[in-house]
Swiss-Prot record:
It is an enzyme of class 2 (transferase). Residues 150-155 are annotated as: Interaction with RNA. Monomer. Catalyzes the formation of N(7)-methylguanine at position 46 (m7G46) in tRNA. Belongs to the class I-like SAM-binding methyltransferase superfamily. TrmB family. This is tRNA (guanine-N(7)-)-methyltransferase.
Length: 239
């Protein structure tokens, strides 16, 4: 199952063409465990959408580098990363409430305190809530490839989106993407390479080996067994 990050089309100035759509946190079929997690752990780890920029030091109760993950699915790999790096703060965004509930349940079970989650459109969160020059890392793992040619424009990785991410990264911050769809990997590489301000961290100027920091997902393990490839891209903000 792909992480379905709602991605708008853009006008000629790079502004998102909004579709009228509201996200209800309880949407989707919830298991009892997910419903329990949303009711009990959302007040602790959940972040409501706001038109105002967030203050990360206040949100997390401390100053620490912030990693933003867009489209965390059921949250298993995100929680693993959060637990492995207690010295960092993590904000995860996912539009499907069952995934948010599952992530909250896992985070509670693991006892992590350095994670906050949102159930909203990631592009709108970036525009309205994330301050410029504030993120150490942005992660986008296995977004929907929209593999049919007529749907390619729906892919979240487009020049305006990548430029938006660039503006939110600190100097030296990294945008890390991964996909199991080779054509999308090539598209990501083309988009990212066209933007002044990013440096490809690949020695061969294309893809990087999977870093130890990114856990292998069950979905990815299944792909490996079937002989599917996975492509990681890491681009640093250098100006």
């Amino acid at each position: 199952m792909k992480n379905d990050v709602i991605s708008p089309e853009f006008d000629e100035n790079g502004r998102p063409l909004r579709r009228i759509r509201s996200f209800v946190r309880r949407q989707g079929r919830l298991t009892k465990g997910q419903e329990h997690a949303l009711e009990n752990y959302w007040p602790v780890m959940g972040v409501e959408f706001s038109e105002a920029p967030v203050d990360f030091a206040t949100l997390f109760g401390r100053e620490a580098p912030v990693t933003l993950e867009i489209g965390f699915g059921m949250g298993a790999s995100l929680v693993a990363m959060v637990k492995a790096r207690p010295e960092q703060n993590f904000l995860g965004i996912e539009v499907h409430s069952p995934g948010v509930g599952a992530c909250l349940a896992s985070a509670h079970e693991e006892g992590v305190e350095n994670l906050r989650v949102m159930c909203h459109d990631a592009v709108e969160v970036l525009h309205k809530m994330i301050p410029d020059n504030s993120l150490s890392m942005v992660q986008l793992f296995f977004p929907d490839p929209w593999h049919k040619a007529r749907h390619n424009k729906r892919r979240i990785v487009q020049v305006p989106f990548a430029e938006l991410v660039l503006s939110k990264l600190k100097l030296g911050g990294v945008f890390h993407m991964a996909t199991d769809w080779e054509a999308y990997a090539e598209h990501m590489l083309e988009v990212m390479s066209s933007i002044d301000g990013y440096k490809n961290l690949s020695e061969s100027n294309d893809y990087v080996p999977r870093p130890e920091s990114r856990p292998v997902t069950k979905f990815e393990q299944r792909g490996h067994r079937l002989g599917h490839g996975v492509w990681d891209l890491m681009f640093e903000r250098v100006k």
